[in-house]
């Protein structure tokens, strides 16, 4: 036995016991010839006293074994911040397992951390830090909690293939060349979507999986090329059934991991409600700032730009930022104007009161009466700011949504506490792709459309067809997304046809699914939740990299291993691959 106790286990009740501890030396102190070590493992820290005749040369972060006796600390040295703070271990024997050959790039016990890329390059050192290991442990608890909940509710965990067929309808696939069949490729799954539908057809009526997924997409600030999702699918169910089981899981999770009781029923907002109220389909409602249609206050005004927008069917919308006038500088207004223009808007308007009688802001000289009218309706007080935008409603919603998000993140962190969890439903089934010059599925092409909408708009305006889809949003993040699925081959063919996929393309990409539908498919639906994002929210960290053991950078690089990297010519020859174009030597 290499240890009898962990470094976070011993208490005053253990005084007098002979124990064996093992771990890393966090720090060393020499007080008048008596050496004190702080020994650390993932469970905690324990103070060690070395005898004066101990001649071993010890370094920080050495991995050691300590055999000794637990003794009570002198009253004046008790550390109430440590679980083991009332005791120390007098070392009778020290065994060094390994010792650093050189100084570490950084030390886990230090408060000042290096750049993130250094932390990721030496992630094995970073993982020794308590806050990092605690997040990995929390991730484990989240996963176990979800597995237990779903298992108790009749779901079974089934593994689906990682090496599968490329069906590019969405992000790019990661491709894996086949050595045994040169010139052909597997794809790593972007999700187990098709396989979980096939499981439903196979009678596995309640399935789940904690599964790795892969997307070769242009990375944004907080995306990873490989990520983990909690994948759920169920047969003979309605949308309400999926939402109910997911709500129960989330409530159980928050209670078990955070000891937080969530309210009875989660709110449900439609996609259109979200966009019209917050300018986003995943708003953080904790910051308030709900939008209002203020067009009626500007029907008569002296501002030509507003008149032009209203006369062409546009709107004027705005929201109130309470107690913000002292922060609304010209510099900030100019920045928000540029953001609005980059999103296709004409800029923003804003106003506040210098005093109960004096208005300041953009266009105040021409719009004083209009602003006063708005202020009366919205109960705008001294030191409040009203932000407005005029134009086509979709652009106005997008502009105000981005402005609202920036103001909330930058200035109202005090409001962004607790948890705001709700559903968004009735997403558009299709969106137009300028790049492909056709309508594509906003979610995926296997989503069941609103059948009344399909009948009404399929020959006129596909953008008006709603999907039987839903997202769960937590604190401004889309944590999960799902839908009721199409289970009829003819309806699925019709959706592919509306997306202008040829019969040949459909057969090549999805023929196996359509064939399966012919042999009896039950009504089914499901949802996939991002484990990385959910854990990050529970841990209260801003990036999913903090809850992944070995994450990649925002550019998809692994600083630890150097991946992606070149491979040798022999490997390429075996795969019958010839490199061409621009590639790294």
UniProtKB/Swiss-Prot annotation:
Quaternary organization: Homodimer.
Function, in words: Catalyzes the attachment of L-aspartate to tRNA(Asp) in a two-step reaction: L-aspartate is first activated by ATP to form Asp-AMP and then transferred to the acceptor end of tRNA(Asp).
GO biological process, one term: aspartyl-tRNA aminoacylation
Pfam families: GAD, tRNA-synt_2, tRNA_anti-codon
Family: Belongs to the class-II aminoacyl-tRNA synthetase family. Type 1 subfamily.
Region ranges (Aspartate): 193-196
Organism, as annotated: Pseudothermotoga lettingae (strain ATCC BAA-301 / DSM 14385 / NBRC 107922 / TMO)
Residues reported in the UniProt entry to bind ATP: 215-217, 224, 478, 530-533
Taxonomic lineage of the native organism: Bacteria, Thermotogati, Thermotogota, Thermotogae, Thermotogales
Chloroplast among keywords: no
The EC number(s) this enzyme carries: 6.1.1.12
Name of the molecule in the record: Aspartate--tRNA ligase
Keywords: Aminoacyl-tRNA synthetase, ATP-binding, Cytoplasm, Ligase, Nucleotide-binding, Protein biosynthesis
Enzymatic reactions: tRNA(Asp) + L-aspartate + ATP = L-aspartyl-tRNA(Asp) + AMP + diphosphate
Principal subcellular localization: cytoplasm
MF term (GO), any: nucleic acid binding
Compartment annotation: Cytoplasm
């Amino acid at each position: 036995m290499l240890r009898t106790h962990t470094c976070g286990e011993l208490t005053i009740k253990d005084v007098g016991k002979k124990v064996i501890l093992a771990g890393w030396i966090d720090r060393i102190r020499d007080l008048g010839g008596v050496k004190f070590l702080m020994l650390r493992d993932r469970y905690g820290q324990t103070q060690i006293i070395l005898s004066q005749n101990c001649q071993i040369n010890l370094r920080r972060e050495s991995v050691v074994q300590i055999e000794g006796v637990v003794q009570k600390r002198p009253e004046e040295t008790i550390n109430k911040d440590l679980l083991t703070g009332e005791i120390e271990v007098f070392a009778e024997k020290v065994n060094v397992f390994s010792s650093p050959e050189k100084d570490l790039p950084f030390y886990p016990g230090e408060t000042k951390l290096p750049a993130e890329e250094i932390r990721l390059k030496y992630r094995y050192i970073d993982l020794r830090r308590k806050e990092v290991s605690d997040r990995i442990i929390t991730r484990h608890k989240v996963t176990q909690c979800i597995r237990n909940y779903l298992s108790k509710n009749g779901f079974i965990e089934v593994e689906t293939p990682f090496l599968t067929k490329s069906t590019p309808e969405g992000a790019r696939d990661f491709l894996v060349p086949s050595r045994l069949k040169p010139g052909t490729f597997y794809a790593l799954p972007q999700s187990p979507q098709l396989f979980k539908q096939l499981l439903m057809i196979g009678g596995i009526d309640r399935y789940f999986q904690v599964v790795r997924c892969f997307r070769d997409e242009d990375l944004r600030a907080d995306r990873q090329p490989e990520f983990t999702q909690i994948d759920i699918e169920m047969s003979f169910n309605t949308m309400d059934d999926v939402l109910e089981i997911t709500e129960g899981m989330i409530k159980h999770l928050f209670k078990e991991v955070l000891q937080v009781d969530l309210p009875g029923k989660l709110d449900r907002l439609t996609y259109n409600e979200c966009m019209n109220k917050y300018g986003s389909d995943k708003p953080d409602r904790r910051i308030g700032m709900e939008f209002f249609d203020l067009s009626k206050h500007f029907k008569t005004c002296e501002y030509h730009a507003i008149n032009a927008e209203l006369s062409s069917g546009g709107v004027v919308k705005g929201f109130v930022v309470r107690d913000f006038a002292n922060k609304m500088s010209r510099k900030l207004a100019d920045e928000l104007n540029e953001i609005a223009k980059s999103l296709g808007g004409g800029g923003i308007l804003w106003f506040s009161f210098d005093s109960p009688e004096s208005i300041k802001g953009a266009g105040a000289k021409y719009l004083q009466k209009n602003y006063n009218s708005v202020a009366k309706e919205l109960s705008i007080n001294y030191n409040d700011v009203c932000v407005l935008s005029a134009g086509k409603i979709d652009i106005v919603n997008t502009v105000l949504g981005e402005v609202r998000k920036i103001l909330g993140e930058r200035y109202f962190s005090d409001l962004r506490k607790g948890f705001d969890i709700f559903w968004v439903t009735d997403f558009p089934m299709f969106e137009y792709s300028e790049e492909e010059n056709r309508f594509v599925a906003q979610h995926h092409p296997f989503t069941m459309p609103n059948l009344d909408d399909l009948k009404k708009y399929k020959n006129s305006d596909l953008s008006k067809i709603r999907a039987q889809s839903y997202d769960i949003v937590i604190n401004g993040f889309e944590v999960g997304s799902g839908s009721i699925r199409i289970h009829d081959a003819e309806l699925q063919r019709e959706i592919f046809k509306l997306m202008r996929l040829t019969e040949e393309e459909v057969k090549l990409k999805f023929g196996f699914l359509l064939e399966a539908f012919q042999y009896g498919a039950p009504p089914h639906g499901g949802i996939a939740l991002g484990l990385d994002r959910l854990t990050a929210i529970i841990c209260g960290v801003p990036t999913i990299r903090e809850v992944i053991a070995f994450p990649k950078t925002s550019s998809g690089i692994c600083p630890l291993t150097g991946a992606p990297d070149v491979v040798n010519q022999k490997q390429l020859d075996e795969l019958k691959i010839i490199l061409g174009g621009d590639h790294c030597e």
